[in-house]
C-alpha cells in the first residue's frame, strides 16, 4: 500500500506500507523522524503524540492508511508550525499559539526552502530563520527546566502547543486536562506545569 500525506508541511510518500503499520512506525522508520517516541504502543503514555489535521493523537494508535491526504505535524515541525501561525497573524503574538490555526491553514501549509525557511523535518535551516530555532513552548521547557530523561518531552510539547493555540490563557486545571494523556516518570510534573505557565505568560505579553 502507498500512502501520500504531508509531514511538517512537506508532501511525503510511503511505499510498501503493510495494513497493520502504525503512523508512529512510518514516521520513525520510513520518514526518519524519531522525535515521536515508541513506548507503550497502546495509547496510554502520550510519548508518540503528533497532530493529525491539527488534532493531537497518539500516533501508535493511528493506522498509516488513515493519514492518506492528511497533514501530520511532529515535534520536529513545531518551530516552523509556530512561525506559520505568526505569518498568518502578524503582530498578534501567534508564534506562541494565541490565535489558533484552522485545519484549512494546516493543510495549506507548505515548507518554502527558497525563502530560507528551515528544514520542515528536522527544524533546522538558515536564511531568515536561524538554524535550530525553537518554538516558544520548546524554549519555555528549557527555561523552566522541565526536561530530565526527555523521553516523554516530544509528546508533551505537541500537546501543550495545541492547548496554548486554542486556549492562550489556560488555568492550571486546563493545563492538567490537556496533558492528562502524557505520562512522565521523572519530574513530578511541576516543572512541566511551570513551563506551560511560562509559555502562556510570554504569549500574553507578546514576548
Predicted regions and their residues:
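Signature of N-terminal electron-transfer/Fe-S-associated modules in redox systems
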Residues: 1-207
Amino acid at each position: 500500500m502507498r500512502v501520500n500525506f504531508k509531514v511538517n508541511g512537506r508532501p511525503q510518500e510511503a511505499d510498501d506500507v503493510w495494513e497493520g503499520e502504525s503512523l508512529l512506525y512510518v514516521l520513525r522508520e520510513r520518514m526518519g523522524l524519531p522525535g515521536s517516541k515508541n513506548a507503550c504502543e497502546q495509547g496510554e503514555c502520550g510519548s508518540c503524540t503528533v497532530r493529525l489535521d491539527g488534532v493531537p493523537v497518539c500516533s501508535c494508535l493511528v493506522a498509516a492508511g488513515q493519514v492518506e491526504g492528511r497533514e501530520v505535524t511532529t515535534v520536529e515541525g513545531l518551530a516552523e508550525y509556530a512561525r506559520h501561525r505568526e505569518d498568518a497573524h502578524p503582530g498578534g503574538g501567534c508564534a506562541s499559539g494565541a490565535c489558533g490555526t484552522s485545519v484549512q491553514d494546516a493543510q495549506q501549509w507548505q515548507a518554502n526552502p527558497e525563502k530560507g525557511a528551515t528544514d520542515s523535518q528536522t527544524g533546522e535551516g538558515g536564511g531568515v530563520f536561524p538554524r535550530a530555532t525553537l518554538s516558544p513552548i520548546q524554549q519555555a521547557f528549557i527555561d523552566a527546566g522541565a526536561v530530565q530523561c526527555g523521553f516523554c518531552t516530544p509528546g508533551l510539547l505537541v500537546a501543550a502547543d495545541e492547548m496554548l493555540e486554542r486556549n492562550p490563557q489556560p488555568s492550571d486545571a486546563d493545563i492538567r486536562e490537556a496533558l492528562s494523556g502524557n505520562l512522565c516518570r521523572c519530574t513530578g510534573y511541576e516543572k512541566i506545569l511551570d513551563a506551560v505557565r511560562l509559555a502562556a505568560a510570554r504569549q500574553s505579553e507578546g514576548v
